[in-house]
Amino acid sequence: PLQRAMRWLDLDIAPVKAGDIAGVDIRPAQGPSYRLDANADGGFSLAPPYDKRPLVAALAPAVAAEPLTRLSPVDVARAMDVAVGAPVAEHITRTKLGVFIVARSWRKDDRGWITISAATTDAATPDAVSQANAINAKAAPWAFALTELDWSGFSTPLAAIAD
């Protein structure tokens, strides 16, 4: 069955572009949780209470906000075999359409994995519900292994973005 699962590596599991993102909530493995909000110019800014902190680099918030846009799994396994206990971190992407895409980070056999699920609010449009259902249909049963660099992008600590 896992050979058939490998075909998922070639699919666009959660098709999100940077311009689709309204904001991101990040609960990293280390440090406090924080939020990033999209700017009118296409970038991202730290939300209160961290919005007054100086950034380590102008693009730092965008790098932390956009790992889902660069999703490139290197392996796949059944989610039930990887997602055991509490996740290491959580990265919630809020799209402008109203879809919440939740990427939970896991560590198994010295590899970084994520599981992906999507949800909407009760007031969601039919398009948002359709997009969330499509993501869940592709991603829900699976855990996706990532390179260390890609995996760490789903758990960027606040200290890596702002002083």
Label for each model-derived stretch:
Residues 1-163:
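A short-motif feature that recognizes glycine-rich, charge-decorated loops
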